[in-house]
Each structure stands twice: as structure tokens, then as C-alpha cells.
Amino acid sequence: MMDRDSFLQKYAGHLNEKQLAAVQTVNGPVLLLAVPGSGKTTVLVTRLGYMLYCEGIRPENILTLTYTVAATKDMARRFREIFGEEYSNALEFRTINGICARVIARYGQMIGKSAFELLTDEKVILRMLTEILVQNLS
């Protein structure tokens, strides 16, 4: 654990007043609306650090969702660069699709079903769609 003032001095000295408020808001949602390059990811990463190091929230109790794989990788990389390895591997950085796939896979395990496979081969997808169309149009 780290006291609030030490954390803010070490990791958040470059943030403005509204960004600091977002970092320190732990209970409830925080909405960050700003133009690209304004520091949204920096605020989120700093907020994660604040939750872990100042509030004592366990990394297993934090889920960070993004829309794209690139954003997920960027956020995880930035967290690791700023805060090191201590919590990096325990935090969940996922896309919305990624967390949904994980929930489905875990549910499948719970009921004794094997995990599904994501089809990415376009030829296989086209063949399956053709079979479905033929079956349903006959």
C-alpha cells in the first residue's frame, strides 16, 4: 500500500484537476470524454494504479474493457511501463468480445461442454454459410 499523497506525487503530478478527480474516483463509474491524445488512457492506467496501491483493491477484482485489441495491448503495456510487473499479469485487460468469449468458455466448463472455437478461416466460414443457406432454402 502507498499513501494517497505519495502516489499522486509519484504518478499523477502531470495530470490536471479533472484528471486527478477521475483517478481518485474509485466507487462508481467514471466517464472520460476528450479528444485523441488528451490523456484518457494515461488517466485510466493511473486510476488502476491508484485502485491497487492506494485503495488496496486486489487485481483479480478489476476488469479493464476496451473496444479494440490494439487498445487492450496499449493499456497493458502502459501499465507495465509505469507500475512494473507486480500486478501486470494479474490484471485483466480485455476487449468486450474477449470477456464475452471467456464467460462463454467458463460456462461451458461448468456444464461439462468443451470450449467453442472461433472460426477465422474464410473458406470454412463460406462453406458453412452455404450449407446453412442450402438447408434453409430447400
Model-derived regions: residue spans:
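P-loop NTPase Walker
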Residues: 1-111
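ATP-hydrolysis module of ASCE/P-loop NTPase motor domains
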Residues: 88-90, 109-138
